[in-house]
Amino acid sequence: MKKPEVHFHSRHESGNTLYILGMVRDVLRKQRRYTDFNNLRDAVLNAGSYEEALQLMNGYVILIDDDGLYDLRKGV
């Protein structure tokens, strides 16, 4: 299964970790991946940094920063 893309703007409201997590939640719910989301949510809430949280979420979807600050294809 191809990972869906989730776009965000790191310099704006949609760059907030919880905002991004909500967008990822919506994608995973549509795919009925409830357990995956629960595990991801717990990991993100325990992440030590913004970058770590992005990397965790990027494991489930393709995160794309439309502001260009974070290139998650190469690592944060």
Annotate each PLM feature.
Residues 1-76:
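Long, contiguous binding/interaction regions
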